[in-house]
Amino acid sequence: MAIERTFSIIKPDATARNLTGAVNAVIEKAGLRIVAQKRIRMTKEQAETFYAVHKARPFFGELVEFMTSGPVVVQVLEGENAVAKYRDAMGATDPSKAAEGTIRKLYAKSIGENSAHGSDAPETAAIEIAQFFSGNEIVG
């Protein structure tokens, strides 16, 4: 299998509770390597650009407000089938439906405050990674 990269965000609800290390432990247990990571405060413009696919949805404003409400940790993860592995490690968007041991089952507060974002495809991952990282920041 080919090694691929995916993009992750540890969201404000998790960073506010100092869960970065705990989330990273789940990521590493899933067999993924963290090859880039930084803690940032997402601007309104960054959040609107990042979530532009949801612009017409009724929750868009709340999503942007939430993602800019506190620090986030943006990451590049690497491994075999990284996109699928990380999505499995995150669990279902609704934490009540997430499998035991997943990030969202363990740490999410609600569907909206679900602690983590992960890319949905390798192509999306490449776009998302480029929004937050330059090539020399990714150390594989």
From Swiss-Prot:
Family membership: Belongs to the NDK family.
Principal EC category: transferase
Cofactor list: Mg(2+)
Molecular-function GO terms, alphabetical: ATP binding; metal ion binding; nucleoside diphosphate kinase activity
Gene behind the chain: ndk
Matches recorded under HAMAP family: NDP_kinase
UniProt-listed Enzyme Commission number(s): 2.7.4.6
Protein name per UniProt: Nucleoside diphosphate kinase
The keyword Kinase belongs to this UniProt entry's keyword annotation: yes
Complex and partners: Homotetramer.
UniProt-annotated location(s): Cytoplasm
Keywords carried by this UniProt record: ATP-binding, Cytoplasm, Kinase, Magnesium, Metal-binding, Nucleotide metabolism, Nucleotide-binding, Phosphoprotein, Transferase
Catalytic residues as annotated in Swiss-Prot or TrEMBL: 117
SMART domains, per database record: NDK (SM00562)
Record function comment: Major role in the synthesis of nucleoside triphosphates other than ATP. The ATP gamma phosphate is transferred to the NDP beta phosphate via a ping-pong mechanism, using a phosphorylated active-site intermediate.
NCBIfam families: PRK00668.1
Organism listed in the record: Bradyrhizobium diazoefficiens (strain JCM 10833 / BCRC 13528 / IAM 13628 / NBRC 14792 / USDA 110)
Reactions catalysed according to its record: a 2'-deoxyribonucleoside 5'-diphosphate + ATP = a 2'-deoxyribonucleoside 5'-triphosphate + ADP; a ribonucleoside 5'-diphosphate + ATP = a ribonucleoside 5'-triphosphate + ADP
Gene Ontology cellular component list: cytoplasm
Key word Transport present: no
Positions bound to ATP: 11, 59, 87, 93, 104, 114
Pfam families: NDK (PF00334)
TM stretches of this protein: none
